[in-house]
Amino acid sequence: MLFRSWFLERVHVMKRGTGFRRRGASATVLWSDITGINVNEGNQGTSNLLSTFTNLKAADLAHALHSLTLKRRVEVARALEDERLADVLQEMDENDRVELLTELDRERAADVIGEMEPDDAADLLREVGKDKAKALLDLMEPEDAEDVQRLMKYEDYSAGGMMTTEPIVLSADSTVAEALAFIRQAEIAPGLASQVYVCRQPLETPTGKFVGVVHFQKLLREPPATLLGQIVDKESATLQPDADINTVSSMLASYNLLSMPVIDENDRLIGVVTVDDVLDHLLPENWRHKDDMRVR
């Protein structure tokens, strides 16, 4: 006899009828789009849970894991690839991700942190305590650890503490076509894709002298062969690394920007603060678990 595994992908749903109507409107929807249903983990093994979670976005998977017991949560986390688990940890609240990270062996935890965005990794290491943070940093790839340590020296709610160190940085003799090619990369977050940063060599943060920015919309209006140095905005607003969150949020709102460059005392670009970085710090700690705040 041949046994097959069945996985739920779509469900037919119907609204409850009102008045004399026996049936309400109906539709067929993806199971991954259904919210408000708790997973009954008692009847599911880890492999079945993983199959259920395959197509979930990282934020939705983090929400689903929150409803599981710690034991089952750890089982799922151990089965996820490093990059996938890193994405999920970035979407968890402080208590959940610290608890989960503590259950992983240190080598695996260090590998996962190395896959996180540097600013999120710095936030997580601040949360686990100095001793454990040092142990994990020692196990990380030196280049990854250096980026994270650079961020950890800033206050959590400052521009330096919230910034990412991996914006799109190009030289003045790069072309519009080259800039758009970077922006098209799937892994570039929307906030970072909103503009490119023009600097002198070196182009990795901390860069050479910061020149200015070119907004994505400007790139779309210019011929592909145009040099960035010809269209760069040299009067763009910038932030100091010690700027507090109120200053950062006010400037983003005032200039209607999705991101802003952070410049040190030597006029070097050291990072970029995005709107989502600021929102993560402004929203209540438990906002991720409020069902009425989730997109439906």
Language model: regions and residue ranges:
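Hydrophobic packing positions in regular secondary-structure scaffolds
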Residues: 1-296
